[in-house]
């Protein structure tokens, strides 16, 4: 399963060139949405396409609060872009919030990223088979941390992996955080046994020796983590 990060607007902006651009981030600071918004703003400034970029983080309802605000204040948001990703479709289809992804207009896909499951470098868990063994003995003994609400990709990916192994995904002990950065910080200080996150967010900490990636949700092994099995 791949996470696609999108830049969305409610409707097309009146001019191709905007002096000021405002980015609405539907999650906390330090997560994938936040870093994507800030990186996109920096690139647009450096390319001379905009004069300045501002950023606003609005957390809540798995991104639903920010989406609702953008839709309800559309007349005042002509220079606003919102960064979101594949879960916006999931949450809309499952009616986790009253708005539809069809109320927004995707204008660019900027990132495609795989999901991973990771453990701390000193963990006794060596692979997904160990996770399964612990889960089968006691589902509550394996807590999975993720930077999004229940029903989002960080929750769905380990749940689907458990279901594929013949287990009941509803028994998964999932610990949600406001953003990927907060999930990583909490996980590295000992909160949770397994981290569900994106490959790009995990790689920095893998290189630093602070965590080990045990599986990646790719159809084949990825070059940047060729030793990691897929699922």
What are these regions, as identified by a protein language model?
Residues 17-103, 150, 167-194:
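N-terminal (or domain-start) structured segment
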Residues 119-140, 228:
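Flexible hinge/capping segments at coil-to-helix
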